[in-house]
Amino acid sequence: MANGLKFSPRKTALALAVAVVCAWQSPVFAHGSEAHMVPLDKTLQEFGADVQWDDYAQMFTLIKDGAYVKVKPGAKTAIVNGKSLDLPVPVVMKEGKAWVSDTFINDVFQSGLDQTFQVEKRPHPLNSLSAAEISKAVTIVKAAPEFQPNTRFTEISLHEPDKAAVWAFALQGTPVDAPRTADVVMLDGKHVIEAVVDLQNKKILSWTPIKGAHGMVLLDDFVSVQNIINTSSEFAEVLKKHGITDPGKVVTTPLTVGFFDGKDGLQQDARLLKVVSYLDTGDGNYWAHPIENLVAVVDLEAKKIIKIEEGPVIPVPMEPRPYDGRDRNAPAVKPLEITEPEGKNYTITGDTIHWQNWDFHLRLNSRVGPILSTVTYNDNGTKRQVMYEGSLGGMIVPYGDPDVGWYFKAYLDSGDYGMGTLTSPIVRGKDAPSNAVLLDETIADYTGKPTTIPGAVAIFERYAGPEYKHLEMGKPNVSTERRELVVRWISTVGNYDYIFDWVFHDNGTIGIDAGATGIEAVKGVLAKTMHDPSAKEDTRYGTLIDHNIVGTTHQHIYNFRLDLDVDGENNTLVAMDPEVKPNTAGGPRTSTMQVNQYTIDSEQKAAQKFDPGTIRLLSNTSKENRMGNPVSYQIIPYAGGTHPAATGAKFAPDEWIYHRLSFMDKQLWVTRYHPTERYPEGKYPNRSAHDTGLGQYAKDDESLTNHDDVVWITTGTTHVARAEEWPIMPTEWALALLKPWNFFDETPTLGEKKK
């Protein structure tokens, strides 16, 4: 009954009536004067709290972020996170409706009994730019003589201070002696410009035009494309071939054009988008009605269609396919409630999160989404370094169909569109458990205006099965539950919604889970069933998942940039390959299991396909556990999933996409730390002609032995469509892990006792 005040129809009317009469017999007083009363339900919901009524216990439960409150009508106390709190004014009932004092929210939720949110006394140097700082950066940039009217903003984000200084702050509390600085990326027409702005001294430190770069697709480009399509008489005429007479019912999806060395007939220096379209039939799912074999090429500078590419006319699939369940009667499901009656086990201080032995900083970036920084683990009082920064590096969704409406489709979702900008607000109780704390985040829009995204990130703790268990005959059972802290973020890029979870285990493991849901991009075909004459040809590149609709085979490939600092920055990549070796020690066995251990000493050697039967470690060979083993973290790019694993790029080596985006084909990369090397696809991948990302970073083959190394893991799935994913796709996951390997001296959760 969250988000609503409801009373069960069970026969408790007499008890409730008595409570109502007793509670409203006379005026209610607070501090010697008559209290001003307001409706509990409306007031608390406007505050953002869930309101629940327990008809049996005659009690309200109020939940807001870290506060879990129980209060009975007429009672002089409430229970807040398991502790008693005196109420200046009790909850009263009148005519079946609950009323509270207008000071109730302050009395209860500002009582200090909820310790989830703490005041940040020393701002973390990696805190996101505030709304005021974003506005200041824009003001400074606009005052520059080089700034041109109508310039748009691709990104306004924190320019990070020196890494060593940030670690000194996180570990010793040493203040960072540097002004707050912003990176500003702009689009002046089709020209990309980078600026670095000193916010404290209100001056521009650098102003750099970037030659040959194509900027991101911005949100107003979507509006421009729709207007161009709607007002084009040429496009309207072509639509008639497809039986469409009203261009106003056509929904466009602007897509980047890729790079084909001129074989697609497109001018390389132009700012172009390809547009595929769908018909809005009124069923709420225009994705089910593709206008197949029709592509408009739009010049964003000229604001016009410069080319229309066509194939054979395929009738638009017209069968209604709503995905919101409007035409289904699903069975009613009883509530499943997750409660934390004594409050949260974690605290949030500014943007720093503390849970169990973990501490980390969290901020949202407009391109890659959440960035987790200064990740440490408290090992018996010693704060140990694990990771300086971890984030999505980039991702790509390439399709395998060569037809006119598909051959160019290879979506670089973060690099071309900005996945942080496309953050989807999280709905508590649906997108995240009901016990989640939702965090708002502020980024800049394309005009430079600060924009706050409500519920951008969810934080929650969950039960995750037994941490360990053993039952010895004749002795008591020994077991404890596993808890996980999840940082969840969702980005909606066109038809797909991507869920990213950073999962902290109390045993030192970090999970990275990438989930894909939403609606598949589908192709209109002639075949209704696999028995139709055209079915074999229609399904050459995909699966018939509905009448006249094929789900085209594609991949979801994710890359994560993980600047691991395992007990410090001098790390080495170590391989351990379990092998079968002959038995030379005697006895009946002819073979043994042994481990071949060796160092991988350079960037080129580190770029590898992942073999799940082997072990790859980032080790600090100068630090040992008590047995003398070097402390390490295991890197597992693919630890399971629900779709076939993407073991590499499903493209021939002579494809341009293969050469532009090397990160797709190998699951493990390790490079030397350089602060400007942040994106596996390169900083400006839109229409890039060669690899400016990981392939370039590793080209100089720097040494990795006892250096500050950055791990990049590529994971994902090859998506072969099935009927059960249409018209909306259940979330499909790819899982990765970072796992302590001789990092500790013993089972790190030994002796844990959880209530």
Swiss-Prot record:
Reactions catalysed according to its record: a primary methyl amine + O2 + H2O = an aldehyde + H2O2 + NH4(+)
Record's note on what induces expression: By tyramine and catecholamines.
EC numbers for this chain: 1.4.3.21
Record's signal peptide: 1-30
EC category: oxidoreductase
Binding site for Mn(2+): D563, D565, D708
Residues bound to substrate: 411-422, 493-498
Residues annotated with 2',4',5'-topaquinone modification: Y496
Residues binding Ca(2+) 2: E603, Y697, D700, E702
Pfam families per the UniProt record, alphabetical: Cu_amine_oxid, Cu_amine_oxidN1, Cu_amine_oxidN2, Cu_amine_oxidN3
Keyword Manganese set for record: yes
Entry comment on modification after translation: Topaquinone (TPQ) is generated by copper-dependent autoxidation of a specific tyrosyl residue.
Glycosyltransferase among keywords: no
UniProt GO BP: catecholamine metabolic process
UniProt-listed SUPFAM superfamilies: Amine oxidase catalytic domain, Amine oxidase N-terminal region, Copper amine oxidase, domain N
Cofactor note: Binds 1 copper ion per subunit. Can also use zinc ion as cofactor.
GO molecular function list: copper ion binding; primary methylamine oxidase activity; quinone binding
Alphabetized NCBIfam families for the sequence: PRK14696.1
Protein name as it appears in the record: Primary amine oxidase
